[in-house]
Amino acid sequence: MPQMAPISWLLLFIIFSITFILFCSINYYSYMPNSPKSNELKNINLNSMNWKW
């Protein structure tokens, strides 16, 4: 079984690293939360925290 040269390992590592960084950044920037819905949920959670001592 032939062995790979160190430059090939470095190139392979660079390609996988760039692919991983691109994949993570695309996933991060593709998520767009719905602002009005999150504000309504926040208000509901704040109003439901009435402690009866």
From Swiss-Prot:
GO molecular function: proton transmembrane transporter activity
Compartment(s) of residence: Mitochondrion membrane
Domain of life: Eukaryota
Membrane topology, as annotated: Single-pass membrane protein
Keywords: ATP synthesis, CF(0), Hydrogen ion transport, Ion transport, Membrane, Mitochondrion, Transmembrane, Transmembrane helix, Transport
Pfam families: ATP-synt_8 (PF00895)
UniProt-listed GO biological process terms: proton motive force-driven ATP synthesis
Positions of transmembrane segments: 4-24
One Gene Ontology cellular component: mitochondrial membrane
InterPro entries registered for this protein in UniProt: ATP8_metazoa
Impact reported for residue 32 to I: In strain: HW00, HW09, NC37, NC48, TT00 and TT01
Subunit structure as annotated in this protein's UniProt entry: F-type ATPases have 2 components, CF(1) - the catalytic core - and CF(0) - the membrane proton channel.
Role played: Mitochondrial membrane ATP synthase (F(1)F(0) ATP synthase or Complex V) produces ATP from ADP in the presence of a proton gradient across the membrane which is generated by electron transport complexes of the respiratory chain. F-type ATPases consist of two structural domains, F(1) - containing the extramembraneous catalytic core and F(0) - containing the membrane proton channel, linked together by a central stalk and a peripheral stalk. During catalysis, ATP synthesis in the catalytic domain of F(1) is coupled via a rotary mechanism of the central stalk subunits to proton translocation.
Name the record gives this protein: ATP synthase protein 8
Originating organism: Drosophila simulans
